[in-house]
Amino acid sequence: MENSKVIVPPIKCQGIKTKIVPFIKEKVERNTDGVWIEPFVGTGVVAFNMAPQKAILCDKNQYIIALYQGIQNGTITNQIVREFLEFHGEKLEQQGASYYKEMRDKFNQNGDPLHFLFLNRSDFNGMIRFNRHGQFNVPFCQKPNRFAKAYVTKIYNQVANVASIMKGKDWTFRCCPWQEAFDGATENDYIYLDPPYIGRDTSYVGEWPEDEAIQLAEYAHSTPANVCLSMWKENGFRRNDHLFGHWSDFIWYEQDHFYHIGAKESNRHPMIEVLAIKR
């Protein structure tokens, strides 16, 4: 794989850092003997592109963790994924929304990571959202032919790519509160932080209140490990006061990018993203 190629993971998520991965790789300097730690691994896009030899990758979403554990230990292969998506994709094409709801109901009963992947790749906008009872509740994307051959092959290749990256590496995936990811971190380690937006009900991890965001800043300042925070600075409507109030002593590197609300070009808005790196 070429260093310039951005590895895209099989899981989709709003706010995924795919577009700024080259920026992160350019700015982050780490001790390759240390451990790469992510308390909010999400889709895993940053970890898969940094490709450290040692990593502790944590998230409160047990289904993401289970999927990557399965790929890592070989119980979920790209061929298994292909056969699963082809089989259920054919039924989806025949039955549409009713079959999507059937698969969603099954997932809410069994929590199977392959069902989670199916839903994630056929729901509305790649959203990951659970209700207060822990049930996945994102609606169908209204595309019965979602799992066309080319799309399944794309996911097949994504699973193969991340499996190849993990092979021979000392990676641990953990479903746990973010605080536990800091335990035992040393000055040789590197902690990458991509927390949720303050005040937003992030749904797959629960609400992210301001007091917890402040606690994260305190942990980041007190840990002996190196730290890099990825966070939005400002857009055309407002600025991130939390970033200015609690991370101003870090070194900031900025990059402009765009985010979309809906499909229209007029809904394309500029955003300044900051990598705040501990001095």
List each model region and its residues.
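Short, solvent-exposed loop/turn segments at secondary-structure junctions
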Residues: 43-46, 62-64, 122-125, 178-181, ...
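SAM-dependent nucleic-acid methyltransferase catalytic core
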Residues: 2-21, 26-30, 73-192, 196-201
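Conserved S-adenosyl-L-methionine
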Residues: 20-21, 27, 31-89
